[in-house]
Amino acid sequence: MAFRVPNSSLLSLILLSLLAIASAKVFFEERFEDGWDKRWVTSEWKKDENLAGEWNYTSGKWNGDPNDKGIQTSEDYRFYAISAEFPEFSNKDKTLVFQFSVKHEQKLDCGGGYIKLLSGDVDQKKFGGDTPYSIMFGPDICGYSTKKVHAILNYNNTNNLIKKDVPCETDQLTHVYTFIIRPDATYSILIDNLEKQTGSLYSDWDLLPAKKIKDPEAKKPEDWEDQEYIPDPEDKKPEGYDDIPKEITDPDAKKPEDWDDEEDGEWTAPTIPNPEYKGEWKPKKIKNPNFKGKWKAPLIDNPEFKDDPELYVYPNLKYVGIELWQVKSGTLFDNILITDEPEYAKQLAEETWGKQKDAEKAAFEELEKKLQEEESKEDPVDSDAEDDDNEAEDGEESDSESKPDSTEESAETEAEKHDEL
């Protein structure tokens, strides 16, 4: 009996991966199992205004494992703020991996699904939208224009948005978002364990002034040829070109039989555009033999640039917090992880989302099918239309009575929050 020997390089990779996972330092890991509520503090932010939303502990309306629960927003037009503390640490000389899963069950049209990492001392009971944070990461959806992953880094007390566009998932299933920051100031953003963006903290955020700038003293040389095409000096205008009329008498026009010259005046044939007329003559263009390209000022060292070898460092990370405003509730968070090992994060994602995603999708599709079947069993079209009219009238009254005054400003509030990000 023959045995196949594993490829040595593949075996080495597997061993390295196992060693990395075994040596991983986990700073925070929350799977929302028993006792989770003792680790998390719900903020009193917005409670005085009756705008603080309640969190539900649930696996959601559809899931891949009913025993795997997370926390879910439960009330529309509400603010949400909750946080957990962990032993303070610095990511100096370490890779920082921030990961969590999120599901929007509510067909989200405007709202966030991001989480924040906070530093220093925070009054968790007062944690809210004005609380300073170090990192904000996760999906954000609002209308047709905003469907992206936020990756905001605080540097010198300024929040800096990533300059690259990273599209987020927009369906109603669970997805895993991972943000990796390395000691060499590079980063990666993953969705469902697949890399969606990578680059440098130097180039993809405006954390520092540019290393190079255009020389303000440089001027384009007078003899610089930046026209790629020029008129052909050998091209000559054809003889008689300017004599060609723009319009000519319509050769097909005929004087009407009932035309009376004495009463109607002398008949004149109408004119039509002359097909021979080509407009103002211009010589044809040829490639400029002296073309040097578009002139650009040379780059020089920026005197205002000062490198920061610890650009990637957050020296006193201590809290993870979820702070949201949601017009429609139903966003569910789970499996929040902060570690120094990407392989451990990948393994956690596969153990949770990876094992459940197919069952969750099947459960969602089954529920959608049942809803469609129920809709098809409704009353005939005419009755439906009549009912819809009645419901619309009732709805207008009930909406005006049931919504708090603050909801009238909800669209403006949401727009303001997105403008601030």
Curated annotation (Swiss-Prot):
Region (3 X approximate repeats), start-end ranges: 265-303
Glycosylation site residues: 56, 156
Gene Ontology annotations for the cellular component aspect, listed alphabetically: endoplasmic reticulum lumen; endoplasmic reticulum membrane
An annotated Gene Ontology molecular function: calcium ion binding
Keywords: Calcium, Chaperone, Disulfide bond, Endoplasmic reticulum, Glycoprotein, Lectin, Metal-binding, Repeat, Signal, Zinc
Residues involved in an alpha-D-glucoside binding: 114, 116, 133, 140, 323
Sequence repeats: 196-207, 215-226, 232-243, 250-261, 265-275, 279-289, 293-303
Annotated region (4 X approximate repeats), positions in chain: 196-261
Compositionally biased region (Acidic residues): 223-232, 381-399
InterPro entries recorded: Calret/calnex (IPR001580), Calret/calnex_CS (IPR018124), Calreticulin (IPR009169), Calreticulin/calnexin_P_dom_sf (IPR009033), ConA-like_dom_sf (IPR013320)
Main location: endoplasmic reticulum
Motif Prevents secretion from ER: positions: 418-421
Record localization: Endoplasmic reticulum lumen
UniProt biased composition (Basic and acidic residues): 233-257, 350-380
Region (Disordered): 217-283, 350-421
Disulfide linkage: 110-142
One GO BP annotation of this record: ERAD pathway
Signal peptide start and end residues: 1-22
Family: Belongs to the calreticulin family.
Role according to the record: Molecular calcium-binding chaperone promoting folding, oligomeric assembly and quality control in the ER via the calreticulin/calnexin cycle. This lectin may interact transiently with almost all of the monoglucosylated glycoproteins that are synthesized in the ER.
UniProt remark on domains: Can be divided into a N-terminal globular domain, a proline-rich P-domain forming an elongated arm-like structure and a C-terminal acidic domain. The P-domain binds one molecule of calcium with high affinity, whereas the acidic C-domain binds multiple calcium ions with low affinity.
Protein name: Calreticulin
Species of provenance: Prunus armeniaca
